[in-house]
Amino acid sequence: MGMNHQQEKTPFLIAPLEKLVNWARSNSLWPAQFGLACCAIEMMSTAASRYDLARFGMEVFRASPRQSDVMIVAGRVSQKMAPVLQTIYEQMLEPKWVIAMGDCASCGGVYNNYAIIQGVDKLVPVDVYLAGCPPRPEALIDALIMLQNKIKYGDSSKKGKRHL
């Protein structure tokens, strides 16, 4: 009855380094603005001084997808806008995450017709769904914190977790 010396162990320097990288990524998110409808007004309100996104490490909204790592899709996506959304998503560098903000981005909302995509998850993988029409700035901050926790604890591979 000897000890099994061939146990698989994570190398000492790799595990803490991976945790450090995930912590750094989660605390320095740079969102790309993709506001399409009334949810964009609430997204702009969240970026204002009253809610202070800087304390969460997200004060910089980027206009270029090459400089951002989080895409917040705020509002309905039409058939004509779908290729633009996919192009912007493809231009973002890895790792990248997506938040579907509002009912229209999550499931099409009240626009159940041929012209509106019934959920952006048909176009790009979504990490966090944010319900509401439009969701309040506090809800967007909660969704961003949920995304931070997914990144920090290594859950970012599980796309599509609902946020209610």
From Swiss-Prot:
GO terms for biological process: aerobic respiration; electron transport coupled proton transport. It catalyses: a quinone + NADH + 5 H(+)(in) = a quinol + NAD(+) + 4 H(+)(out). Pfam families: Oxidored_q6. It is found in: Cell inner membrane. [4Fe-4S] cluster binds at C38, C39, C104, C133. Binds 1 [4Fe-4S] cluster. Its cofactor is [4Fe-4S] cluster. One of its GO terms (molecular function) is quinone binding. The keyword Cell inner membrane applies. It is an enzyme of class 7 (translocase). Its EC number is 7.1.1.-. Keywords: 4Fe-4S, Cell inner membrane, Cell membrane, Iron, Iron-sulfur, Membrane, Metal-binding, NAD, Quinone, Translocase, Transport, Ubiquinone. One of its GO terms (cellular component) is respiratory chain complex I. It is a peripheral membrane protein. InterPro entries: NADH_UbQ_OxRdtase-like_20kDa (IPR006137), NADH_UQ_OxRdtase_20Kd_su (IPR006138). NDH-1 is composed of 14 different subunits. Subunits NuoB, C, D, E, F, and G constitute the peripheral sector of the complex. Belongs to the complex I 20 kDa subunit family. NDH-1 shuttles electrons from NADH, via FMN and iron-sulfur (Fe-S) centers, to quinones in the respiratory chain. The immediate electron acceptor for the enzyme in this species is believed to be ubiquinone. Couples the redox reaction to proton translocation (for every two electrons transferred, four hydrogen ions are translocated across the cytoplasmic membrane), and thus conserves the redox energy in a proton gradient. This is NADH-quinone oxidoreductase subunit B. It comes from Protochlamydia amoebophila (strain UWE25).
